[in-house]
Swiss-Prot record:
InterPro entries: G_patch_dom, PINX1. This is Protein PXR1. Residues 25-79 form the G-patch domain. It comes from Pyricularia oryzae (strain 70-15 / ATCC MYA-4617 / FGSC 8958). Coiled coil: none annotated.
Amino acid sequence: MGLAAPKNKRKLGNDPNNTRWSRNTENFGHRMLRSQGWEPGQYLGPQDASHAVYHTAASASHIKVALKEDNLGLGAKMNRGDECTGLNAFKEMLARLNGKSEAAIEKDKKAREAHAMNVYVERKFGTMRFVSGGFLVGDVIQEKKEDAEAESTDGTPEPAEATVKKEKKRKAGRDDDDEAQSKEERRRAKKQKKSMKETGSGGDDVTSEEDSAKSKSKKSHKSKKEKKRRKEEPASDEQESEDEESREKRRKKEKKERKERRREKREKKLKKKQQREEDSSSSEANSDDETTGVDTGASTPVASGTSTPVSQVSVRHLARRRFIAQKRMAMKDQQALNQIFMIKSS
């Protein structure tokens, strides 16, 4: 309705801190949480959880959200530009002039680099604090019972020493048994090898004949394979040479076709340019004739009995053509260009 609408005056002083929304208990979120059994002032989640010990007053307060307008990491801050480049190198040079040793200068340089790295990490990722695993799992921390351990250690040490000696004796006995078993196994293996050699002397002739027959069959098989390979190799070489020749011919044909296409495109472009230049030159000549005709007619009117034909071109187009013609004449004239660009001719 504009100015005729009813005017509603609002007082901004009723809620200057903008806390009315936090005290409002009739919104959708409060109603939904109440339906699930939650009440104002309570924590979210089960009350008897293992991590409920670590809840504080901040767990029941409102969540604060900050708008992130940059692409930096969480907690990172923009470079404020208060760092002077080259200042550290200048300080090192002054220290050398004052007679400071190279080892001390290198130590200071490493300390500065470590400090800069820590500052960068804190800006990029925030301060990192390592917590024990119990906090992550949610266990309750319990102090160790030192008294019970002290009582157990204060007992009689003599029986413990006796048990240790017994265990050592048992281990020594086991080691002796293992060595005896290994020696017996070696002896048995040697005896078996000797018996195998004695029994296998009679059958050497038969095995030698079988081995010779097998070697002959293998040699014949290898010779046949070599002959086949020799026959197949020239045929494969001829096929490869033919394939290469055909590929080269195709490549040459494709190159020729591409060159012809490029020539045709160039010729078409040249023809189009020539036509445009001819059209533009003819239109300029016509426009010059028309402008001269209009000027002469306006300056010296001639009375005649017959009606003269009126040009159908608008006055705006005629003025624009005249302006373009004048501009071209000025661009061709060197003296006019010097006047435009404020160049003094010597």
